[in-house]
Amino acid sequence: MNIRTRMKYILLILFSLMGFLITSASADCVNCNFDEKNLANITFKDQNLSYASFKGAYLVNADFTGANLQGSVFDGAYANGAIFVGAQLDNSSFKSVELELANFTNASMRNVIFEGAYLVHARLTKKQVLESNFCDNLVEDAMKFIGWC
């Protein structure tokens, strides 16, 4: 086996280990940097990820149920189908994020920024829209929320 093949196996093992640690560890990850990472289908359930950065991350179907995401930054992320049920998202930023089919049921969303976000079929309540800065931001599918702002 040549060195290039060995390196591929080592990287595969390391990335698998990283996924295992993220999905099974319950340690806090305050101020963590996940920028540009592929975190599709990863479970962050009930974890403290406050002030974490997910800029440009691939978060399709990621599960943030009950997570503390206060002050986190998701700018430019691709998070279609992401689950934020019961998450604490106060003071977070979702600038230019793809959030099609994202579920924000029972999430706390005070002062959340959605500038340029794409929210087709996302689950948001009127209360969440009014608590966030949604009405102050240019949102791609704002027609869905006419009459709420």
Tell where the protein language model's regions lie, with residue ranges.
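Tandem repeat scaffolds
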Residues: T23-C149
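Bacterial N-terminal signal peptides
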Residues: L12-F20
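N-terminal secretory signal peptides that target proteins for export/translocation
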Residues: M1-M7
